[in-house]
Swiss-Prot record:
Membrane-spanning parts: none
The encoding gene: rplR
Family according to the record: Belongs to the universal ribosomal protein uL18 family.
InterPro entries: Ribosomal_uL18_bac-type, Ribosomal_uL18_bac/euk
Function per UniProt: This is one of the proteins that bind and probably mediate the attachment of the 5S RNA into the large ribosomal subunit, where it forms part of the central protuberance.
Protein name: Large ribosomal subunit protein uL18
């Protein structure tokens, strides 16, 4: 029973992810910031979809943070610094099928506070 519930939950997230990705894409001047969260950590990438390259990436394991709101704020500050060093101050936020709530919302707000326009 539990395995079926988890499969359904993950498959619904992947459906949401595909609907979102059909509508957004990243350019060199305005990359797509994709977030992935696990139970232990958060992973973030700034992706330029035209050439299919990752401009910069950061994750909670390297920074030694947990997958909570305060950890998301630290991660946002790190990725905003990397983007600013490349001269990028605008991006498209890809929530990757997750609800815009909790850690995902805290990450997006912290990005805005650190000077990245979403």
């Amino acid at each position: 029973m539990v395995a079926n519930v988890l499969k359904r939950k993950i498959s619904l997230r992947i459906k949401r992810k595909r609907r979102i990705r059909a509508k957004i894409s990243g350019t060199p001047s305005c990359p797509r910031i994709s977030i992935f969260k696990s139970n232990r950590t958060i992973y973030v990438q700034a992706i330029e979809d035209i050439n299919a390259t990752t401009l910069c990436a950061s994750d909670g394991r390297k920074l030694g943070i947990k997958a909570n709101k305060s950890g998301a704020a630290v991660l946002a500050k790190d990725i905003a610094g990397k983007l600013s060093a490349k001269g990028i101050n605008e991006a498209v936020f890809d929530r990757n099928g997750y609800l815009y709530h909790g850690v995902v919302a805290a990450f997006a707000e912290a990005l805005r506070e650190n000077g990245i326009k979403l």
